[in-house]
Each structure stands twice: as structure tokens, then as C-alpha cells.
């Protein structure tokens, strides 16, 4: 068993707002969702699927940095917090659209992706198929 040390992490209001808003969407979509599961941002469960969700704020248009951080954090948390024989499905949540190349990169890593739109949530095909987003990008 690995222990992750407690530390103070500064999170922006954008991050907190994104997590809260998406958590509300998950509840409406009949997921059991948790938003207070430190160090994870969100966890969700529906129909026997457990999802580990990492939320990322895209700062100054730097999608690449946010995507790389999401990949690293999802891999780390899945490894440290879940048994090897009971790994969660993984999803990255962003404050804005990330573009086709990054959607495909995340999919290649087995990670679904989602971001807000004016009228709901868009995402990768995996996210839409799982009910984590309303429409494909």
C-alpha cells in the first residue's frame, strides 16, 4: 500500500467551478459521483464502471501542458490508489475544447476526454458512449 502525503494545493475557482458543474451533470446522468475524494478530482460510477476523472484548467491556451498533466496524474492515481486487478476507467475533464489531436492522443492512452460547451458537455467517442458527454466534438 502506498501513502500519498497531505499537502496544500492551490486550486483556482475555474477548477472548482468545473468540478462542481461536471459533478452536477454526472448526478443528472444517473452516475454516483464524488467530488471530495482527495487527491482525486472526481470519481464516478454507473452500470458497474468506475471512472477516475482528472480536471484540468487550460491556462493561456496551453492545451499540451494540461493534457500531459492529466495523463500523468491519471496514471499515478490509478497506480497508487487502485488494486492492479481493479483499475478504474480514466477520463480527463478540461475547461475548454482540446482539439482532435489531443482527443486522439488521450484515446490512444485509454483516456476519455470531456469539456464544456455553451449547451452542455462534448467529448471523445468513448466519453459519449459511456454517458460522460452529450455529444462528440
Q: What do these predicted ranges mean?
A:
Residues 60-71:
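Active-site-adjacent loop/helix micro-motif of nuclease/hydrolase catalytic cores
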Residues 28-50, 107-108, 125:
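An acidic intrinsically disordered interaction segment
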Residues 65, 112-137:
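Non-catalytic C-terminal interaction segments of nucleic acid-processing enzymes
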Residues 79-118:
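Nucleic-acid nuclease catalytic cores
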Residues 1-34:
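Acidic-basic catalytic patches of nuclease active cores, encompassing PD-(D/E)XK
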Residues 22, 42-44, 49-60:
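Conserved catalytic cores of phosphodiester-cleaving nucleases, focusing on short active-site segments
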Amino acid at each position: 500500500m502506498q501513502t500519498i502525503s497531505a499537502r496544500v494545493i492551490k486550486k483556482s475557482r475555474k477548477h472548482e467551478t468545473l468540478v462542481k458543474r461536471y459533478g452536477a451533470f454526472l448526478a443528472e446522468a444517473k452516475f454516483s459521483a464524488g467530488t471530495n475524494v482527495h487527491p482525486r478530482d472526481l470519481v464516478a460510477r454507473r452500470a458497474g464502471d468506475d471512472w477516475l476523472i482528472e480536471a484540468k484548467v487550460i491556462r493561456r491556451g496551453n492545451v499540451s501542458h494540461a493534457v500531459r498533466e492529466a495523463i500523468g496524474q491519471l496514471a499515478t492515481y490509478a497506480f497508487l490508489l487502485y488494486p492492479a486487478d481493479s483499475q478504474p476507467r480514466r477520463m480527463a475533464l478540461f475547461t475548454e475544447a482540446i482539439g482532435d489531436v489531443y482527443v486522439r492522443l488521450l484515446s490512444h492512452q485509454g483516456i476519455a476526454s470531456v469539456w464544456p460547451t455553451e449547451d452542455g458537455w462534448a467529448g471523445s467517442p468513448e466519453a459519449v458512449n459511456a454517458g460522460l458527454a452529450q455529444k462528440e466534438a
